[in-house]
Every structure is written in C-alpha cells, then in structure tokens.
Amino acid sequence: NRLVFGGTLAQPDTIWMSQIGKYFNFDVGDAEDTDSFDLTAATGQVNEIRYMVSNRDLQVFTGSGELYIPTYLNQAITPTNAQIRKQTPYGTEFILPASIDGATIFVQHDGHTVREYLYTESEDAYTASAVSTLSGHLIQHPRFMTVVHSGFDLADSYAFLVLESGEGALFSSNRAEKRASWTRVTTPGMFSSTIAVHNRLFTNVYDAAGNLHLCEFSEDVGLDLYLYKAVSTNTVDVSDLYNSGDVVDVIGIKDGKQSYLGEFTVTAGEEVDLSLYSESAFTHAYVGKAFTAKIVSNPIDVTSGNGPVTGDVRGISNVILDLKGARSFKINNRSFSPDNALTGKKEIRVLGHSRDPQV
C-alpha cells in the first residue's frame, strides 16, 4: 500500500516507494518496515525505467530490459527485503504495457515485436516470448495499446494497438484453450488513440475529411461510422457525418427487422434517396461504411501414402464457414447474398486446382 515512482532525469534507474499508507511521505526514517525507501537497478548498466506494472509482482519495464521486484507470501515489501531482479534483455517502447490473460504484454523497443512477460514455473523466472512472430508484418510502430477483458460478450481478452500508419492491430488471447490470433483493423480514415473501459473498447478516429470522432467497437450493426436516422419522404438526412458525393451503405429498418439495401451516393442536399424502396415503407435506417472481414488461409497441405503433397497440383473441393448474422460474403470471387442473415455452418463447393491452394 505504497505510492511508487520510478526514474528521473538524474536517476533514471531508481525506484522510490512512499511510507505504507502515507502516499506523500518519502522519509526513509530508520528503515522500519513501514518507512519509505529507494532502490537502484544495479545490473551492470543503466536501466532507464519507463513503466511499472503491478501484477503478480511489481514489474519494471526499462529501455534495455525487463525487471521485477518480488513479493513474498504473507509479507509486504519492506526496506530490508526489497530487491530488483533483471529477467529479460529486450527493452520496452514508450507504450504502456498492459495485463492480459494472466500475463503482461509490451512492445519491444524496436517497434515491431510484441512480447508476453509471464512467470513460468519450469524456469522459476519471467520469460518474454514473442506473441507476434507469425504476424510481425502487422506490428509497425504502435503508438497506443489497451486491453479489454471478456469484451464483446466473449470469453477472450483483446489487446488493441493503434499503429503509426493509422491502422489498428487486434490481438485475442485465451490461454486456457491455447488460442491466440492477430487481426488487422482498418477504417475509412485513421485511428488516433484507444482506451478500454471495463468490457467496452473506444477509439478516436479521424475520418477521410479530417474530422475527429469518438467511436466504440460494437457488433450491433454491420457498418462503420454509422448514423441512425428516421426515413422521411423516402430520404435520410446524413449531413451530420457525410457530404455530397460520399458513397455509403444503408440498412433499412421496418418492424424491428434489418434489411441491407446496398450502396448509395449522398445527394447534393446531403441526403440518401431511398425512392427505390418506397414500397417497403422503411421507418428508420442505418447509414455508414461497410467493412469487410477478410480471411486468407495458408496453402492446404497434407501427407498422403506417398509422402507430403507439397508442390503437387491439388484442389479444395468444399469450404465450411461458421457464420454469425452474415448478410453477404464472398469466397474466391463468388458472392453470396442470402435473403436472411445466416448463423451457423454453411458449406460451399469450390472449383480449381493449384500448387498452393488457398481460400
């Protein structure tokens, strides 16, 4: 129960801890258990302290390595038992590390690698394994990172990184089931920053016109940067967000049911004309930008009775998709637009042969 500071210009590798329960008292006194104290990371080099995370222990992230101050069972950290131990040599970028699924993830100082700082019983030490090895091309100088736990009504935890390019990278982790994955996230415009509040994920987004918006990730509507408006005389006013000439997607609402109407061009009056659907009598509409979830499989490879078939001409005959509320999808340039949203498994037969067959 102490206030902890780490690193100054004069003493970049020093940590100061206040007296217990007295957050503004840093008097070292007589080195009693409740007194304040300071520690220097004497590891043979200057460790510029950048961040500290209170997790299983007090984890210390520096520009040249990862350290920690161990805690002891049923014992508080005191001036007589406190010590700093160096664990891994990678160094941390100027991005706040975050706890996720029992570990702490951080961006390595090169700006291209995300690592997982985790205590392992087998080594009796902390390790910092890379979790972005197969997706290193997605990690391009992150600027912000946040974690949402059990977000979107799912069991997994998610880390969202805002990249220098304005794109996003989403990391999902479920350690109990040994599942982890990376996904590139884009938007019309660019992501600026991000923050998680409980199980909700927010981000600042600059649209194509340079306007700043506070947005929330939600699965309610399959549109990006959308407006919910009433339909009046077969038109929808979108002047709050869109300009004349913008191409938008529209979902019509009637009796609580959603129907995807397609793409529309905003008129000179900054409205969307729904005259083609006047007979449907839609009362409200969602107007926004459609986004695409794209998955590209690795080349399918198997081992036959004669050995691996790598490099042989082979084909994929059928694909089974596990869908949730899908209103349209495309497989190998074949488009599908069911009358009603599909949820569940859907089998699609495909044609073609290749030495590296993919879907």
Language model segments and positions:
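Surface-exposed extracellular loop regions of Gram-negative outer-membrane beta-barrel proteins
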Residues: Q59-N74
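Catalytic-domain carbohydrate-binding cleft regions of carbohydrate-active enzymes
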Residues: I84
